[in-house]
Design a protein with these regions (language model features):
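Conserved, mostly hydrophobic/aromatic
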Residues: 17, 40, 70, 126, ...
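Flexible, glycine/charged-enriched surface loops at secondary-structure junctions
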Residues: 34, 199-206, 355-359
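Generic N-terminal amphipathic, Lys/Arg-enriched alpha-helix
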Residues: 1-12
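Active-site-proximal beta-alpha core segment in soluble small-molecule metabolic enzymes
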Residues: 38-172
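N-terminal glycine-rich anion-binding loops that anchor highly charged ligand groups
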Residues: 16-46, 58-60
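C-terminal accessory subdomain/extension
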Residues: 265-365
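Active-site loop ensemble at the mouth of alpha/beta enzyme cores that anchors a bound cofactor
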Residues: 213-298
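Active-site loop/helix belt of alpha/beta enzymes
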Residues: 123, 130-246
Length: 365
């Protein structure tokens, strides 16, 4: 199955993707929430088609370019969950003339430029910052939010959809209780802001949230309207660390050719470095890596069962990366069975970054 792999390659287990997506759909259905999955994790038409086979008709992307890619494969309802880039107004108009598109704003300049330059209607989402401090208006500043809604109301082509947030704080904690506490805090703030906007005359606003740890761990989604998780399709080492999934649910591995073996330092070196795995690291997880890294790692080695991975190989992790090299610590017995030219299957810390880096070298099984 892997004879054709000659360079670092993202291997995608389609059966695991389908199972992960089915589980997330079930969680959304139990909460009566529309699932609008983020497609940036995989950026792959094959995965998008799995979603659509399961009944999903709307998606989320992070750029106009990505929206064009998926629109070409039949997606006709996409939200660009990134602050609108006004330099792409021509591309926005071309896309909005073909499909339903949602745009994200948090300032009046963007709203005014869109109102003046749009040729087709778009859905407009106001970005709210519930604590990530990246983009968005604070839910504690309802007057600023109302002013933005008022600005948008003056244009017949700006259809105000609602309030949108992404609470990245959930990626920095671990376990159901900690993730749930942050989710409840953020969702409650969003729902309160919607109620306040209703008092100011802006009724019918939807609330859209989106992060995989919350969507995977929180049982009660508190009545929000829409959820936009994306990483759940693949999961990764970071999600294992938050408790969002078990290692067995990770649907991707980076297949890296072994180029050197160094028993004297308990290491192998693979062709698979920062440009393939990224430089994002993950704190050690002793329960999954007995004898594992003291501080952090750049990926873990999957235990292979035939042609499929299932859990982690004990005591095996990527201790460091340079541009093309990956230095992999391994236990002596596992190292003794390894040969130069073999493949090691690495669980990436952040599958979104690995998938983007290896989008031209992806192998589906």
């Amino acid at each position: 199955m892997y004879e054709s792999i000659t360079v670092p390659t993202l291997v995608v287990d389609g059966a695991k993707v389908r199972l992960n997506a089915s589980r997330m759909l079930d969680r959304a259905a139990r909460n009566k929430v529309v699932l609008r999955p983020h497609l940036k994790t995989h950026q792959a038409r094959q995965v998008g088609r799995i979603f659509r086979e399961l009944g999903l008709g709307s998606g989320t992307v992070s750029s106009i370019t990505m929206a064009e890619y998926f629109a070409a494969d039949g997606w006709d309802d996409l939200t660009v969950a990134f602050p609108v880039n006004l330099r792409e107004l021509d591309s926005i108009n071309a896309l909005a003339g073909r499909i339903r598109i949602g745009l994200l704003v948090d300032n009046a300049d963007s709203v005014r430029t869109l109102a003046a330059g749009l040729k087709h209607p778009v859905d407009l989402w106001v970005k709210i910052d519930v604590g990530s401090h990246r983009c968005g208006l604070s839910p504690e500043e309802p007057d600023r939010v109302a002013a933005l809604l008022a600005e948008a109301a003056g244009s017949p082509l700006l259809h105000t959809a609602g309030l949108l947030t992404h609470d990245s704080r959930t990626y920095a904690v671990r376990g159901r209780e900690a993730v749930s506490a942050l989710y409840h805090e953020g969702a409650t703030a969003m729902l309160a802001l919607r109620a306040e906007m209703g008092k100011k005359g802006y009724s019918g606003l939807r609330v859209s949230i989106g992060d995989t740890p919350s969507a995977s761990l929180v049982e009660d989604w508190l009545g929000v309207d829409e959820a936009r998780p994306g990483n759940f399709a693949y999961y990764d080492l970071q999600q294992v660390g938050t408790g969002a999934c078990q290692p067995e649910s990770v649907a991707v591995a980076v297949a890296c050719p072994v180029v050197g073996i160094y028993p004297e330092r308990s290491e192998a070196v693979v062709y698979g470095g920062a440009v393939h795995l990224s430089k994002q690291s993950q704190p050690a997880m002793a329960e999954y890596l007995p004898g594992g890294p003291p501080d952090s790692c750049f990926g873990t080695v999957f235990r292979m069962e035939g042609e499929h991975w299932n859990g982690f190989l004990p005591g095996a992790w990527v201790r460091g990366v340079t541009q093309e090299h990956g230095m992999v610590h391994m236990q002596a017995d596992d190292l003794s069975h390894l040969k130069v030219g073999d493949l090691l299957f690495i669980c990436p810390v952040h599958s979104c970054l690995a998938a983007h880096a290896l989008r031209e070298d992806t192998h589906f099984i």
